[in-house]
Swiss-Prot record:
The keyword Thylakoid does not apply. This is Odontogenic ameloblast-associated protein. It comes from Canis lupus familiaris (Dog). Residues 1-15 form the signal peptide. The gene is ODAM. PANTHER family: ODONTOGENIC AMELOBLAST-ASSOCIATED PROTEIN (PTHR16237:SF3). Residues 127-129 are annotated as: Interaction with ARHGEF5. It is found in: Secreted; Cytoplasm; Nucleus. It comes from the Eukaryota. Residues 97-123 are annotated as: Disordered. One of its GO terms (cellular component) is nucleoplasm. GO terms for biological process: biomineral tissue development; inflammatory response; odontogenesis of dentin-containing tooth; positive regulation of epithelial cell proliferation involved in wound healing; positive regulation of gene expression; regulation of actin cytoskeleton organization. It holds the Pfam family ODAM. Interacts (via C-terminus) with ARHGEF5.
Amino acid sequence: MKTIILLGLLGATMSAPLIPQRLMSASNSNELLLNLNNAQLQPLPFQGPFNSWIPPFSGILQQQQQAQIPGLSQFSLSALDRFAGLFPNQTPFPGRVSFAQGTQVGQQDPSQPQTPPQTQQSPNHVMPYVFSFKMPQEQAQMLQYYPVYMLLPWEQSQQTAPQSPPQTGQQQFEEQMPFYTQFGYVPVQVEPVMPGGQQQLALDPVLGTAPETVVMPAGVIPYLRKEVINFKHANGGIFVPSTSQTPSTTNYFAPAIDPTITPELMEKKAKTDYLKEP
């Protein structure tokens, strides 16, 4: 059991960063800007959990300075110009510039030759990260001719639908009649010209009838009548008893014969009753 505990402690101490290493991350951009001197990148301060415990070793520092990558240890003046106008915690990203250039090239005429963005290489061959966002020529043409105004369904149907055949005068007159004629009021209105000649229909504003002098064309049934139809019936179902004191011998419960029924209908009814009897 003791050996297992000792091995655990030994592994924990071996895994601890006894020799702190240099941190080159984006969070140290402020220190990177402050430590630039004469176009040379100075070593950043050591960061680690045991900085206060371990004294500096000059031999190790010299070895670490010699073992630095040549591309990161020295920067040219052209590379330092990019860091000059930046705030802390910001690094140059050439991909954004190339993205803007790519969109501008896509909006230009596709017939013109497209020149790729030139990337300047520093003397120490430090290649910046360049992400090309160029659009192909087909997408550029599609964006250039993209329709701005789209036809709505009803507008498209109005444009593509064939014209309806010309309507007759009677149909036009029925369509032009307002809705309040259904309630009995017929205003004075002029009928459109008929094929047989110029005929004018003068309507009576009081009775809603038309004079007999109007001649309708052949095949058209007039819907206005001269005579006024009386819908009142003589025997409307209301019984008024007589006020005389003499008794009446009439049977009030007998059905009254409608005088409008013709004798032919009575004979036909009698024949059907005779045939129904056994």
